[in-house]
Amino acid sequence: MEQLITPQKYVNPMIDVAFKYLFGTERNKHLLKGLLENVFKRKINDIIYDNTVQIGDTLESRSACFDVVCKSVDGPDFIVECQVRSQKYFAERAVFYSSRAITNQAPKGDWDYNFKPVYFLGLIDFALPESVGKSEGHVQSYSLRNDDNSTLMTDRVRYVFMEVEPFDKSYDECTNFEEKFLYYMKNLPTFADKPDTHNDKYFEELLMEAEYLKMDTETQAQYERRVKEMRDAKNVEEYARKKAIAEGREEGVALALKALSLLKEGRSVQEVCKETGLPEDKVRALAN
């Protein structure tokens, strides 16, 4: 019999089922709208979800990188992506998918390239590499600017990345909306009781909707399955690491972890064998 997950008071919003429930449903549209307004510093009259767009290319990749796509009725299109595992080219991925959102606006025939703005928000469970020109803090904002004088070339494309897991401030140390949002995104699952939000309406509503018991039975079951899958995957990864170390193969640790990462990205067993040099039986054992 499958062991049930003991629910916490609040769900983990970085798990895809919970994230979509909190920010990707009509019921909680106000939470996404408030997030986008505060992050991109602009008033949004209303948003419309675009469920026809799927960022992830495979089931495996969507479990690690999932998205909410929406359009504002009077302004930009938004891509909100949540990445729970480090990815080497995540910044480039953001540029690629925002570019796709732009080209999808092109009509058949003549076009003057007057496209709607596309804003990308990435919530990530890791730190961006220093190579992307990071500033201090855990909220990184990028736009297209002149290299010499930083004059804005166009406001039609913007990228904001919010580092959830590396965020280490207490609530009292938070000085703005973005930091408070990161605080709750990271710490929600650890709260046994409702924390003091200092009467902040947005976070009062976020906490209310993030209660596990607030979910319907079907969503609770989906959430529990995802928690179990993530725990199982973590255990497999740890087992592969310990087994390789026990056998005295440091190189084996790296290869096993690389193989696991490729499998989780949706790569076939044959592709993983070719890229890592591991035998097929070893790769299949990691996949099961």
Protein language model features and the residues they cover:
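Short, charged alpha-helical interaction segments and adjacent helix-coil junctions
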Residues: 2-8, 78-83, 183-288
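Conserved single-residue anchors adjacent to enzymatic active/cofactor-binding motifs
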Residues: 1-220
